[in-house]
């Protein structure tokens, strides 16, 4: 797991939590929760890959791991669309930078999850 990705997650979550987007703060809190969930999922997949013999254990723990993987990719696509939308409507440069970095992070995480999942298949 790339330490830069971990610090990027922490940095973006911290900055997003400080933003006040008026009536859409509830949406932002939902995005933050999704980011945190995605980070945990990515970390657990990465750990499973590190143990490499853990596919059997992963399948036993969650017989529907492929379905869960598909749901995570849907969440990533949803988050990408939400971040793009927020980026389009915000005029604050601090928020724009944060959303651009969040978008880059989502693309990186999507690629990492794809790589991990191919190694597990």
Swiss-Prot record:
Interacts with protein M1. May interact with host nucleoporin RAB/HRB and exportin XPO1/CRM1. SUPFAM superfamilies: Nonstructural protein ns2, Nep, M1-binding domain. It comes from the Viruses. It comes from Influenza A virus (strain A/Leningrad/134/17/1957 H2N2). It is found in: Virion; Host nucleus. Its main location: virion. A motif (Nuclear export signal) lies at residues 12-21, 85-94. Gene3D superfamilies: 1.10.287.230, S15/NS1, RNA-binding (1.10.287.10). GO terms for biological process: exit of virus from host cell nucleus through nuclear pore. Keywords: Host nucleus, Host-virus interaction, Transport, Virion. Average number present in a viral particle is estimated to be 130-200 molecules. This is Nuclear export protein. One of its GO terms (cellular component) is virion component. Belongs to the influenza viruses NEP family. InterPro entries: Flu_NS2. Mediates the nuclear export of encapsidated genomic RNAs (ribonucleoproteins, RNPs). Acts as an adapter between viral RNPs complexes and the nuclear export machinery of the cell. Possesses no intrinsic RNA-binding activity, but includes a C-terminal M1-binding domain. This domain is believed to allow recognition of RNPs bound to the protein M1.
């Amino acid at each position: 797991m790339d330490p830069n990705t971990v610090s990027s997650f922490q940095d973006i979550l911290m900055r997003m939590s400080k933003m006040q987007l008026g009536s859409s703060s509830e949406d932002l809190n939902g995005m933050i929760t999704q980011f945190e969930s995605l980070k945990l999922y990515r970390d657990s997949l990465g750990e499973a890959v590190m143990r490499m013999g853990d596919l059997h254990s992963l399948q036993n723990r969650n017989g529907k791991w492929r379905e869960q993987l598909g749901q995570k990719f849907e969440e990533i696509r949803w988050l990408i669309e939400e971040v793009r939308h927020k980026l389009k409507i915000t005029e604050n440069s601090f928020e724009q930078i944060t959303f651009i970095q969040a978008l880059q992070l989502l693309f990186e995480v999507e690629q990492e999850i794809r790589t991990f999942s191919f190694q597990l298949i």
